[in-house]
Amino acid sequence: YRPRTRFAKFFNLPELMIFFKEVADVKTADQLHLPTPEVEYHTIASKPTEHQREMVKELSERASKVHGGAVDPHEDNMLKITSDGRKLGLDQRIIDSLLPDEPGTKVNRCVENILRIWREGEAGKLTQIVFCDISTPQAKTAKKKGLAQDTEKPFTIYDDIREKLIAAGMPPEQIAFIHDADTDQKKKALFSKVNAGQVRVIIGSTAKLGAGTNIQKRLIALHDLDCPWRPRDLIQRKGRIERRGNDNKKVH
């Protein structure tokens, strides 16, 4: 790794706040009492598969070799191990697409919940948002660069979820990836469809579907498939549904 200089802390913070308040009126969300929906949180725990258990052991063995200096840092390091661990925690097929799609996994549990909420919200055309920063769709970008013309389409969690939702009866036009809206005009059109209930499940990453996204009108549920690196990204995710302008009094 390389050492970096980073901001650490403020000095004389009380004095700084006094100066700042001479030109600014600061109110936090809890002081404003904005009309936002009540949020009910659910933690869905999935048991690891046998393949995942074995792979976790391999990650531990790799970490021991890295800490012991038995491997070249260019070949393996803790950043690579941590990245593989995040992928493995989401779905074993991200590591090896030939591994089986087993029932009860995190992705399959999420699909079940999406379908249940979709059916329950049919009358009001209620919508859902799925956040996933891992295994995002890259096929269109690759094709534009001429890299994926003759190769098999890579496995992604996004495609897997969409295929399963369609197989269970959800119309394809009601499912959208934020990655397909690659211009501001396309994003605006997509967001309008979500607010109108025409697109009822939208899947995206925190970077593309986080700050600045206003699709809250019919949002009834938000699914966090993975956990982002920065705590503030979770706040941005939550802010898409716990927001003024949501017609639902209670969301999940």
Identify the residue ranges that each predicted region occupies.
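Conserved SF2 helicase motif VI
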Residues: R230-N248
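Conserved helicase ATPase core of P-loop NTP-dependent helicases/translocases
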Residues: R162, I166, P171-T206
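Short, solvent-exposed loop/turn segments at secondary-structure junctions
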Residues: D25, H51-R53, E61, K87-I95, ...
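Conserved RecA-like ASCE P-loop NTPase motor core of nucleic-acid helicases/translocases
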Residues: L126-I134
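Inter-lobe coupling linker of SF2 helicases/translocases
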Residues: Y1-P100, G104, R116
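A short beta-strand element within the Helicase C-terminal
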Residues: N214-C227, H252
